Amino acid sequence: PLLTVLDEALGLEHGVTTTIHSAMNDQPVIDAYHQTDLRLTRSAMQSIVPVDTGLAVGISRLMPGLAGRFECLHVRVPTINVSAMDAALTVRCDTSAAQVNALLHNASQQRLQGVLGYTEAPMASIDFNHDPRSGILDATQTRVAGTRLIKLLCWFDNEWGFANRMLDISQRLATFR
């Protein structure tokens, strides 16, 4: 959701994201065999593991205008739940951290309420466990280098947020009879 807001307001040019993701079910608890990725043979609870991601493809499907302009990395970390996206984004319009935060705060209070969150509280990953929103901007971490390079940190409980979006879709579909 935050990419849409920033693209509409400031015009996204390029982006590099790193998803810092909790351990997944295909990772072993102790070192063990993995079919496709040697890094994933390492214990999920003892290693920080870079893995492949299809996020850039997903972004281009949701936002076709950004196709070919995003690169994404994915790192799995030894936590049980709650992940974060660290995004570096270039935009067409000059901006500031205060303006970026204001744009995202307004969206979280209006059209994306319940989907996009916003916090200025000093929180850590565990504080977002079972948060139903798709992403929560940590406004204390927003940075702007120069006037067009934005750095953001967005927290999310992947499965819980996804389940809530599926519930939203189901409720919406139920209105079409």
Sequence positions of predicted segments:
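Residues that form or flank phosphate/diphosphate-binding pockets in enzymes
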Residues: 1, 95, 161
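C-terminal substrate-binding/catalytic lobe of Rossmann-fold NAD(P)-dependent oxidoreductases
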Residues: 13-14, 19-150
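NAD(P)-dependent Rossmann-like dehydrogenase/reductase catalytic/cofactor-binding core
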Residues: 129-177
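Alpha-helical support elements that line or immediately flank enzyme active sites
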Residues: 1-10
